[in-house]
Each structure stands twice: as structure tokens, then as C-alpha cells.
């Protein structure tokens, strides 16, 4: 039953990859490329989450939390000299956010918070005012709001139950943008589109599609493929730049990608692209299981013999070898590759090893990506 499930899952993964490859061969430019001048920027900040129900940082184990509490209270005009704080309702957190391109002051962002100390849960807490800075050290946003946590943590004196991660959460729309990123989009005459998956065929096809549009609208060529990732677009003199990009990003192009096999060794997931080919190769698959069991015996001395208790080791070694199976794989198509692997009853972990060996033998005509 398990072997049938493994075969079904592998076949489903390959069929799904083949469906994606054929269904998404034609895509809009906005779905496969982005404007170089319109990239995202990362923001980061340090703050405090308050209002926790005894699940915050222990101030003895997290001295930076104690320092932050005192600094915050002093900024609010409250003196903290001569007193020791023993609260467990506050947690020090790292706050991160992504600033999208062309974001204007007053817009809101989602932020993510993560505990820095030994807090056990951020559920029910509130992030107090935290400034978010970019890589240049400038403050671009300020975050504050209630923290939403997906997991839960319950514990008693002798048992504890955890589900999900309770030491990290999100503050939806918790940050307000205070500073606009400098942008030369409106003043630019040359724009660069960057492919998310670099490929020369796709880049050349994108430039050709843009030039066909430009020939009909402006009577000339405006695009040129610079390399496998970048396509240069020159703004016509009488064109409105925003209108031009709106038309360009909705053009439909034929996308291409190299043959690729993606393997995640931790989860056993294997995704095989439709264009993967395997030269004729023989594969032998078999397993050897060795089990070592230790069953020591305690030998007690006779009464009044002045002997000592002895430890007598007892080791049992068993070896079991499953008969190896030989199959001829000729991957003229993706279906034949899957059928060949399934015919010898290979489990997902065995398929990973076989694919790596086929690649080492030079018979796998595809890029092997290990995650």
C-alpha cells in the first residue's frame, strides 16, 4: 500500500510539473519580470511587545530587555532609578518589513516580529512604537499595533503542549511609511526589465514582443536584450512613461526554462520538469538492512559468596538483503522516466540517490538542484 502511494505521489508531482510547464508557457511580462528601478527594500527595527500574560522575557536572562524598558520609560518622563523590575509581561523583539517600490508616505505595511529573548509566547501582546530603518540607516516607517500569533503554547507542572510558533507573529498594516524612497522613474529615458528566471530565449522573445508593440504604436524599435536577465527599454519622446509600462507589462510572451530536476532531501520531494531527458542507462536497485541489537545480561553472585554483580554483554547482528532489480531507463519522454523508476519499486529516498547517480554518469540531460 505504501509503495502504491509513493508511485502515485511521484507520478502526481511529475504530472503537475508537466501541466505547469505547458499551461504557463505563455505569460504576461509583469508575471516573469520586474522593473529594475522598482525593487523592494528591506526594513528592520528593534522594539518591545507589551501586555503579555506572564510569557515575556525573564529580565535576569535577557538584560537587554530590562535596559530597553528603562530607556522607554525615561523617554516618557518616568524615573526608574532605585527600583528593580521583575515583570514578565514584556518581550524584546526584532521587527522586519518589506518596503515596496513607489510606496508613498502615509501608506501602511505589514510587519513581522520575532522574539530575541526567552519569551515563551507573544500571543495577546502589543508592539509599541518602533522605528524601521533601511540599509542606509534612514528611518522609513514606524510600526505599532497588536501582534497576531498563529500557534499556541500550553503548559502545566508536568506537561507542555506546543503547536506552531508562538515566539513570532505579524502586525497587519502595523507600519506607516514616513519617508519615500528616492526614485528616478518619471525622469528616466531608459528602463531595464529584469527576468526573475534568467534565460536568453525568454529575454530575446521579450524584446521582440516589445518591439512589435512599439512598431505599431511608435513606428520603431525600443527594446534590446542585454543579457539573459536584462531587457533595455528606451522611452519614445512623445510617450507617457506610465502608460508605456502599463502596455508593456501586459504583453504576452513565450517563456522558456532549462530542463531541471529539483530535489528536497529533507522532505523527500522531487519535482521533474517536462523537458528532462535521460539517455539510455541501466539501473540496479537493492537494499541491505543491518540491525545490531544489544541485550546485556546482569549476573548476580551466589548468596554469601562475596562475589560482585557482573555485566555480561550480548550482541546480536542481523543482516537482510532485498533482491536487487535491474531496469533499463530510456527517457525519451518524461512519462518513460517515471514509468522506469516505478517499475523497479523505488521509494522517494531511493529515487533521490538514483537521480544523483544518473547525473554523475552523465545520462541525465537536466540541471539537478538540491535543496
From Swiss-Prot:
Q: Which residues form the signal peptide?
A: 1-25
Please tell me where this protein is predominantly located.
periplasm
UniProt keywords (A-Z) are: Bacterial flagellum, Periplasm, Signal
Q: Where in the cell is it found?
A: Periplasm; Bacterial flagellum basal body
Q: Fetch the InterPro entries from UniProt.
A: Flag_FlgI
Q: Tell me the GO BP annotations in alphabetical order.
A: bacterial-type flagellum-dependent cell motility
Any one Gene Ontology cellular component term annotated for this protein: outer membrane-bounded periplasmic space
Q: Does the keyword rRNA processing apply?
A: no
PANTHER family with a match to the protein in the record: FLAGELLAR P-RING PERIPLASMIC PROTEIN FLGI, FLAGELLAR P-RING PROTEIN
The UniProt subunit note reads as follows:
The basal body constitutes a major portion of the flagellar organelle and consists of four rings (L,P,S, and M) mounted on a central rod.
What the record says about family reads:
Belongs to the FlgI family.
Q: What does this protein do?
A: Assembles around the rod to form the L-ring and probably protects the motor/basal body from shearing forces during rotation.
Q: What is this protein called?
A: Flagellar P-ring protein
Instruction: Name its species.
Output: Sinorhizobium medicae (strain WSM419) (Ensifer medicae)
What is the gene name?
flgI
Amino acid at each position: 500500500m505504501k509503495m502504491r502511494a509513493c508511485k502515485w505521489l511521484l507520478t502526481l508531482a511529475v504530472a503537475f510539473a508537466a501541466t505547469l510547464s505547458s499551461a504557463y508557457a505563455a505569460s504576461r511580462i509583469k508575471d516573469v519580470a520586474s522593473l529594475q528601478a522598482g525593487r523592494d527594500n528591506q526594513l528592520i527595527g528593534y522594539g518591545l511587545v507589551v501586555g503579555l500574560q506572564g510569557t515575556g522575557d525573564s529580565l535576569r536572562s535577557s538584560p537587554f530587555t530590562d535596559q530597553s524598558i528603562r530607556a522607554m520609560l525615561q523617554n516618557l518622563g518616568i524615573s526608574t532609578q532605585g527600583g528593580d523590575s521583575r515583570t514578565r509581561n514584556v518581550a524584546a523583539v526584532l521587527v522586519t518589513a518589506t518596503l515596496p517600490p513607489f510606496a508613498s508616505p502615509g501608506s501602511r505595511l505589514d510587519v513581522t516580529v520575532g522574539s530575541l529573548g526567552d519569551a515563551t509566547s507573544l500571543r495577546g501582546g502589543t508592539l509599541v512604537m518602533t522605528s524601521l530603518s533601511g540599509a542606509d540607516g534612514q528611518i522609513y516607517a514606524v510600526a505599532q499595533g497588536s501582534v497576531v500569533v498563529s500557534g499556541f503554547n500550553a503548559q502545566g507542572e508536568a506537561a507542555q503542549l506546543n503547536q506552531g510558533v508562538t515566539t513570532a507573529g505579524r502586525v497587519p498594516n502595523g507600519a506607516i511609511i514616513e519617508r519615500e524612497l528616492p526614485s528616478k522613474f518619471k525622469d528616466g529615458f531608459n528602463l531595464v526589465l529584469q527576468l526573475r528566471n534568467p534565460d536568453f530565449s525568454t529575454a530575446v522573445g521579450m524584446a521582440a514582443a516589445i518591439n512589435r508593440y512599439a512598431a505599431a504604436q511608435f513606428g520603431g524599435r525600443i527594446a534590446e536584450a542585454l543579457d539573459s536577465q536584462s531587457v533595455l527599454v528606451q522611452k519614445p519622446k512623445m510617450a507617457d512613461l506610465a502608460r508605456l509600462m502599463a502596455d508593456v507589462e501586459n504583453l504576452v510572451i513565450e517563456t522558456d526554462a532549462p530542463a531541471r530536476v529539483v530535489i528536497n532531501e529533507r522532505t523527500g520531494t522531487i519535482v521533474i520538469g517536462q523537458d528532462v531527458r535521460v539517455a539510455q542507462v541501466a539501473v540496479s536497485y537493492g537494499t541491505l538492512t543491518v540491525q545490531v541489537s544489544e541485550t546485556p545480561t546482569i549476573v548476580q553472585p551466589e548468596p554469601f559468596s562475596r562475589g560482585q554483580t557482573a555485566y555480561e554483554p550480548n550482541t546480536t547482528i542481523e543482516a537482510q538483503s532485498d533482491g536487487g532489480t535491474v531496469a533499463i531507463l530510456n527517457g525519451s519522454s518524461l512519462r518513460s522516466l517515471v514509468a522506469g523508476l516505478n517499475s523497479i519499486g523505488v521509494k522517494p529516498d531511493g529515487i533521490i540517490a538514483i537521480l544523483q547517480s544518473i547525473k554523475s554518469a552523465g545520462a541525465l540531460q537536466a540541471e539537478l538542484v538540491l535543496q
